[in-house]
Each structure stands twice: as structure tokens, then as C-alpha cells.
């Protein structure tokens, strides 16, 4: 009888005299894990599978051939539709799986190698039970735990799913090889470092106590060697930099994702989780090349503190962005890494050997300047100058400052990627050649990740900016102004993304205004800007051989933030956070008068459209600041006597040809119509006596309503022709190959900048609808919502006026012309209804409109009562109403209806176009 003496690690030591007697038994429980894996790998090395055991569920449902690609990890059919291969279909066939006719031999092999059937010997010394359940390798490395590398045969039906899509049991590397080194080198450069910031024993006890992992007692002795090797390599890990810290998963979430792998093997029926955690059949190099990101993405069922879409992504995750946080609460021993080193240290993308380096980022930057910048310059400088700002070697700075610079630039890249990838129009048809799935699988997977983790990406990126803020403020005098410009541009980009998506909260806008105010950005507009030190400004810095005035650039950023604040106030009816009067800031700071070096856009056509849109934002700011509902101490009689002066924003000749000019004119006419309709209520009897004879006021109302309907029709038609989905359409404006080259400044400029000299003439500097095809506008959603509210309220007026004219029977000269004009307006209303159904922002928000009704303001009949009317109830009675004879009951109802329309239009202006109320 042999005797086994347990060592200090709990692993029995074999008797040397029994080596010959036990050499023939592969499954002997006294053998070590590493030797057993090596023997099993050598024995089964010749049985390599060449393809998936069966077709995926998507191909089986479509009855097409499943062409599986080992490099991409998905079949061709799933790749074209942007899905992941699933193998969750329950088989109906009975009997063993293919190539498993000999059940007895396989059962013997599985019994020898199944760790769950291994019985550890009793320890001869006292031991804490919590240490037995601690999978140290799984807790401190980004590879799955030991239990996840072996898939036990729980039921007869689940046994044949072990081989989908690869036979990972027969083709895997030795665990001792994986655990011997704390860093797995790859052929693409960089090391994948294990996490050294965790206290292995204490964290393991806490997680087991909280129930985050399922203890597997049988794994205690089996993982002792690996646990010992992992603990010995911890001092080496602390000396290495970690380029693979994931910013989109917090420390606790990343911890739970790694600890879940030991739990996956004990849950029944979770075949998808098993397939996701299994190693690929190739060597360690193949593992790093094909499955690195899927292993570090976490388990399918982990719980995150964000929205539920994160769980959906983790099931099919093959890519996650890399971001290096600078949280001061977690000290790091990392060395300073240059920007080029950070770019090369990004995680490898599935199915591609090209890393996401500076070349592909210039492509993202080119998409922004082609599809976003032409409508709203979130980055208020031309592309060539901004590209120079991103150069990390200009100017030369010390290592500590370079690290801050690189972190800020990385934040900006993440924010710009979220903006671009979330607005790419995905093509389901295989005929399109500009879809991300056809262009680059890496880009396609980025888009999926950013869409499914949209809120989390925005929150984490902004939190990183807030973390950097104290360091930036403390070292403001030595940090270059170009880095501070990129920092505040990132804040503008994040707010732009949320407002573009129709976010109805200001959780990010308020802190953003606070950051600008903390750096005293508002003092740049005040007369005493030269008498006090500016945190934002250093001395003017050279960009190439030219000097940039960063004071003008920071003023542009603050004005853009003011316009974003205006759009939120316009939609939601809330007070503005920035109430500074900038005057004619657009013409002063954004036109080409500021100088050729810092012009917003070099192309005259694009610059003209930018100025028009910014002037629209300037007008809406003036429109919002003059809301009567926000003027608490204004006397009631000012409702009709104090009229807003819009003479400063007079419509120029030809300005109504574009969308911005039409919408500005629509808002002006809306205010005029409100005054006319409310004046009818004051002198209703007098108007009704002469409404069909000499009432010029009723005629003006009809003409005003018809002109507003025509404007709405023109606005919606232009939006539909330009970009109905308000997303990036690469088919309408393809990107040139110049974005992959950086040899000259012309190649870094957008296609709109390659213009001929004849465009400098006045008539050719107007931006047409053709120039805006496929571009994205932040004004589109407020325009569609406001047009919908206006049409819903003034739509019944033409029908009411036509019936009034016909019922009175007075068909004098001029009445027929009025009826024809009103009939034309009715035809346009039909076209407007069809246009609304084709607009993507309206369709996405239509189902939420029923929730925006103000229930407390409804009458007993169920009709909405105006909020503004209740505010001014009894305060706007007409002084001459008692001197007018009573009119007919039916005409009174018509006038009352017109007055209610005026009040509701006023509600739309005062309470926000997003919170609309209808009958």
C-alpha cells in the first residue's frame, strides 16, 4: 500500500517506488495536472477537427450552407447580417454524437480527465475552508478559470454540444504553460498582463461570501500548482505596464466577470456560456489572435450596474475599447507611455491583423469632418490645424505632462468613435459595399459595442475627464493650450452625442457647464479678461510655422456649449444654464474674419452652411431667453403690450432657401400668429360681426397659417431629401482613399475643401441640398418635433375658415381666392403627413408622445387646457368687451377654438416642443 505525504500546498507527493507501476494509468489521481495535460495533448494531437460539427441556428433556419471562418469566429451568413453564430437548438436525434461510436473508451477517458470527479485527499493540517474555493488563476488573470477549460458531461443531450464550434477538449495547451508566466506575449506586440491590484486571498473570501462564484471543492487539489505559480509571478507583474485596462468595465465588474468562469461549469443547460469560455483549438498564439477579446469580455450572465444591453453584448463580444484611466484613488506604478506606444498597445481585433492605429483614427476623423462638421462644428477649427494638435511630439514636454496629454487625447478618440460609430447607417443588404461589415470587421464590431453600451461609454468617458480635471487645473500653466482645447472639445462632443440622440435629461450638460465655469471660460468675453490670469490660456503656441489664437478657440467652444444648452431648453422648456449675452458672436468669432489660420472650415461652401446653422442656434437662444413663462416678476399686462423685438434677426434675402432660414422664419411667424389669435379673444364680438365683410384680421390669419404650412412642407421635404434617418450614409458621400495617407496637407483635408477658384463668387458659396446629402444635423430632431406640434395645432384652421366662408354665403371678390389658398394648404397637409412617416427621429419618438400629456391640465371632457391660459386667467380681459353686442353661439365656439389654438401654440413655445399637448 503506497503512502502519500501531503506537501505544504495540499498536493500529495507520490512514492518514487511506484512510478513504474502507475506509469500506464493516464487518469491516476495522484498525477499532476501539467503532466496529465501534456500526455493527453500528445495522445490526441492527431485528431484535429477541420470545421464546425454542425451548422449554426441562423443558417439552419434559413436553410443555407454554414460557411464557418476560423479567423472571424462567425460564419459568412451571420457576418453579413451582423450577428453571432448561435448553437442553442436542441437536437432531436438520439444516440451518440459523430465520431463517438466507442462509448466505453470515451467514458473511460472522460472519467480520468474530468476534474469534477476527482476526489482530493484530506489535509493533515488545519486550513480555512474559504481558501479551498479560491481559483487564483481565474481571479487574477484574464484567462478563464480551470473549471471553464473542462466541460463536464452533465446530461446525455448536452454531451454532443461540447464540440461546437470547435473540439476544445482534445486540442488545448497545457495549463502549466499558461500559468507559468504572468504575461502572455503575442506576435503582434505587447503583453497581456495579469491583474496585480487584487488581494487574492481576501478578495476571494469576499466574493465567495457574497455568492458571486460557486465553490467547487473538487478543484482544490487540481489547481494547487497553478495557484502556486500565479502567486510566485506577482512581483514580476508589478513591474510591467498594463496597456489593456478596460475603461468600460469597472474594477468590481471586471472582477465578477473573471470569477464567473468557475460558476459556468456547474450550471446546467448553459451551453452557450460553455462555448464562450472554452479555449480555441490552436496554440497560445492562436488563442491571442482569435479569442483574446472574447475571453476578456467576461461571461454571458454577468450583472453590470448599467443598462441591460451590456449583458446582451457580452454574449457575442469580440471587441472592447481600451482606455487607461487615471483614477488617483488607485495608484499605479506604470511608466509613462508615449502616444504611439499607446496606439500600438491596443487589443487585437478579431479577424484582422491591422491594429487600430493612427491611420484608422484619421479615417474616423475624416468621417466627422465630412458628415458632422459641415452642419455643426463640434471641433471649431479646420481639419489640417486640428490634425497638427493631435501630434504628441509637438511641442516636446516632460514625461509626466506627456502622460496627461496622451490620456486626454485618448478620451477624445473614444468620444469621437462613439459619435461616428453610433451614427453609421448599417446596411442589411449584401449589395452595399460601404457597410462597416464589408469595410472592416473591426469597425463593425466597434459599432455594435458602442450601440449596445451607449450610455455606459458616455458615462465612463466623461468620468475619465472629470478624473483628469484636478491634474489639468493644477498644471494648467505647463500643459499646452492645444491639449486643453482637445479636453474641452471632448466635453462638447459628449454633450453633442446626447442631444443628437434625443436625450431628455441634462445630467451631463450641467457638470459640463460647471467645468467650463471652473476654468473661468466666461471671463474671456468680459472686458477685464486681461486684468486677471486665465487658466485656459498660456502664451500663444506655434502650430507649424503659424500662431493660433487660443482665446478665440476657447470662446468658440463656450459659444457651442451655449447653443447645446439652448437646444435642450428649447426642447424641454427648462431654464438655460448659460445666460450670458454674447451679442453677434457667430459673425465675430466663427467667420473667416478671425484669420486664415484658425478658420472653422476652409471651403467657402461648407463655411457658409456652418454659419447659417450657428446663426439659427443664436436666434433660438434669443427666442428662449424671451420666454414669458420664465419671467416671473413680469406684470400680466405685458403679455400683449410687450412684444418681442425680432428686428435684429430679420430674414435676409435668399436666407429662406435653406433649412435653417426656413425654420427661423417659421418660428417668427408662429409668434405673430400667437398674438393675432389671442387678440381675437379680447375683441371676439367685434370681429364676428364683420368677419366675412371687412375683417382684414381674419384674412391675415388665414394667409399666415397657409404660409406656415408651406414652410413646414418645405422643411420636411428638405430633411427627407438630405438625410431622413439623420445618420452617416457612406453610400451618398463615399470617403476617398486620402484618409489612409498622410503625405500632404491636401490629403488630410475633406473633399469639400478641394474646390476651384470659381466657387469664391457670391452665388456659388451657397450650400445646396446636394452638398448636404447624407450629413448629420443636430437641429433635425427639434425641427421635426416643432413642425409636428405646429401642424397638429394649426391644421384645423383652414377647414374651419373654409366652412365659415361657405356658410355665410358671401362669395364676394377675394373670398374665392382665400378658399383656393386654404384648399392648397389642405393638400400640403396630406403631403406633410406622409413626410412625417418617413422621418426616422419622429418615428423613434412617436411612441413616447402619449406619456407627455399633462394630466392635471385636462378638463372634465378630456380636452387639454392651456397651461399659459391658466397662468394669465382673468388677467387679459378686453377693456372694450362690454361695449360689444353678443354674437351668435356658433361663431363664439369658432372664436373660442381659435383662441385655444393660440394658447396652445404659446404652450409649445414656452414649455418646450418636446412636451406637447393636444386635444
Curated annotation (Swiss-Prot):
Which GO MF terms does the UniProt record name?
A: DNA binding; DNA-binding transcription factor activity, RNA polymerase II-specific; zinc ion binding
User: InterPro entries of this UniProt entry?
Assistant: Carb_Metab_Trans_Reg, Zn2-C6_fun-type_DNA-bd_sf, Zn2Cys6_DnaBD
Q: Which residues bind DNA?
A: 56-85
Provide the protein name: Transcriptional regulatory protein EDS1
Please verify whether the record's keywords include Hydrolase.
no
What gene is this protein a product of? EDS1
Q: How does it assemble?
A: Binds DNA in a sequence-specific manner.
Q: Does the keyword Zinc apply?
A: yes
